[in-house]
Amino acid sequence: MAARFELLDDLPAACLSPCGPPNPTELFSEARRLALEQLLAGGPDAWAAFLRRERLGRFLNADEVREVLGAAERPGEDGAAVAEDSFGSSHECSSGTYFPEQSDLEPPALELGWPSFYQGAYRGATRVEAHFQPRGAGAGGPYGCKDALRQQLRSAREVIAVVMDVFSDIDIFRDLQESCRKRGVAVYILLDQTLLPHFLDMCMDLRVHPEQEKLMTVRTITGNIYYARSGTKVVGKVHEKFTLIDGIRVATGSYSFTWTDGKLNSSNLVILSGQVVEHFDLEFRILYAQSEPISSKLLSNFQINSKFDHLADRKPQSKEPTLGNLLRMRLARLSSTPRKSNLGPEEPPKDRAKPKRPDSEASTISDEDYFHSHKDQLEDSKVADAATQTEPREEMAAVSLSEVGTQTSSSMMCVGTQTTVVTRAASSQATVWSKSTTTQTEADESFLPQGAQSKEGSPASKMSVSRSSSVRSSSSVSSQGSLASSVSSHVSLTAADLHTPAYPKYLGLGTPHLDLCLRDSFRNLSKERQVHFTGIRSRLTQMLTVLSRRTLFTEHYLSYSPGSFTRASTNLVSVRDIALYPPYQ
């Protein structure tokens, strides 16, 4: 008896039917196949004529005829060309041997994770829970299928796998999105390829891009494909509807993820748990292996139609200085002949002409005196530049100086760059004027650690804190009086050079405090230049020492004889000093 039961288990299920194995003529009909060929080639009229001639019954109704003709893809069309391209690209690494039931291509992996159930693992006793819609009034409400499905989705902890024909219900999609983002549940969605645009329209309304979800994968599947002898193929639709939850529960039935099925249409939903879920697990993995990613052509059509333009990453422009501006400012501060860095200030209005100060940029006139003497001209101007930094009056508000050396006004954009004098390089300074208040900042040691300021005991620093706004001792001479392109250029600008006939009114150099400021400025400038030249001198000395050692390397370590040529004696110190002290005519 035991052997008899084993033999019965080995037989196919069709042979155990009371009616016996199915008749092959019932599974395949050559006449119907030829009728379908006539339908694809000649249309409904040719199909009807073939049925009358062969005395066949109408095995397709009117809706099915329209669906078959709508799903037909003839060779040379856009859809067929795209399918052939995708087929060829996916089979580049495959062999040329034909195996109908096997493939040497790797199926797509479930990259988001999958429950680890080995084949034949026990998943519990099979239980069935049926839901129908609409329900009776005494059962608690008419929307049983949708409520039961959403309850199952909210209880998921590991994975949710959906196979659906059409998906356009916003509430269910939000439940899936919440499971991905808040609970970290992996979501796989397989949709019918022909009904995918409805899903993308829903994503557009919700302002969600399916490709940007980290724990959600959306792919497309199709039904069976019928190939005609003429090359035309008919792609079937997907009518499978089930949702697999954590590998232990599955919800299946006639209910689709649409608003009409949730509110209007009559449908049913069956929730299965236990060992029967293993069959749905295997079916989903088979469908996922046959699935394809969302067509790039379809996504491009949505992008061309500006349906996903709101999802583009638009980063606000940063108001902070960029790296390029910071590097240019740093180079300007360390150069011997600096230039004022340009951060792109606002251009003055065209209707207002920017007034120019009649004196030179190297002038040491007090800005307060100039302001009172040209008050009428400065009322209509926004910003003016000067090469010297003056002390603000006590009743004016001072603005702190930023680390990058940019001095701004409280009501204006930055139009000037203040580069303080450092110990290794000379720099230029610029002041910013405003219409209402003078926004010059007091250069404290906490804000300008590298600034070369006057000593506390010097007379110039004592006069700079007084009510009469004097010129600060840290004012530098403009680059007009120096050789801007030379590293070792010497600026010897004396007080006599400033007595030009063009400015007899403003250059009163006979005052004591101006003489002290000029003397202190030239003293600081000479010290900085000496330190700068000393650094260059030391680097050149080191380079010459390295070069002199390289000439003796081959003789001592490589046993190389220099030969019979005469080596000229060269004083390396003189070579070094030639670059430092060029002769001036």
Swiss-Prot record:
InterPro entries reported in the protein's UniProt record: FAM83 (IPR050944), SACK1 (IPR012461)
UniProt KW Cytoplasm keyword: yes
UniProt biased composition (Basic and acidic residues): 347-360, 369-383
Residues bearing the modification Phosphoserine: S295, S458
Amino acid composition bias (Low complexity), ranges on this chain: 458-482
GO terms of biological process kind: cell division; cell migration; cell population proliferation; epithelial to mesenchymal transition; metaphase chromosome alignment; positive regulation of cell cycle G1/S phase transition; protein localization to mitotic spindle; regulation of ERK1 and ERK2 cascade
Main location: cytoplasm
Family: Belongs to the FAM83 family.
Domain comment as written in the entry: All members of the FAM83 family of proteins share a conserved N-terminal DUF1669 (domain of unknown function 1669) domain of about 300 amino acids. This domain mediates the interaction with casein kinase 1 (CK1) isoforms. Therefore, it has been proposed to rename DUF1669 the polypeptide anchor of CK1 domain.
Quaternary organization: Interacts with FBXW7; promotes FBXW7 degradation. May interact with RAF1. Interacts with KIF22; recruits KIF22 to mitotic spindle microtubules. Interacts (via C-terminus) with DYNLL1. Interacts with HMMR. Directly interacts (via DUF1669) with CSNK1A1 and CSNK1A1L.
Record-given protein name: Protein FAM83D
Gene name of this polypeptide: Fam83d
